[in-house]
Amino acid sequence: GYGSTTVTRAMGDDEVEQWYAHWELAADEPNRIHWVLDLEGEAVGAAFLHAINAEDRRARYAIGLYDPSFFGRGLGQQATRLVLQHAFETLMLHRVDLRVLDFNHRAIATYRACGFVEEGRERETCFLDGRWYDDVVMAVLEHEFAVARGGRRET
């Protein structure tokens, strides 16, 4: 998860409910779209476009999976590509960016596979487990996403 350097256990039911409650409140905010990631009828995570700015045609992306047992299955990459497809083809955005803590190598690799490129770092933005971590700033532009997916339409 975002708030720990290692993910060693699944979120408990109470934690998942709190996480959903936080994002349900946020879902009422304008300029935000969220999706529940469903695997065979089970909610396994969520993805968000927020800070959507129609004038500048940009938004910020976030995604989370609740349980490490879902890691490594390609769910994050599939969800990210579908959200980006919606962002660029339906919302007609030009740019989608995100921030990810520098120790989250799996997420960074997923974002790169979806066309995101590193634009910079915000140094020592998060203090966890007695140590400072950087936020890596990444973004993908509409033409970069088209190249990254090889002209294939995600289904």
Language-model region placement:
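A structural signal for the main folded, soluble domain(s) of proteins
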Residues: 89, 118, 142-145
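Conserved catalytic-core motifs of GNAT/GCN5-like acyltransferases
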Residues: 97-100, 117-133, 137
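GNAT-family acyltransferases
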Residues: 1-69, 140-155
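Glycine-rich acetyl-CoA-binding "A-motif" of GNAT/NAT acetyltransferases
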Residues: 42-45, 106, 132
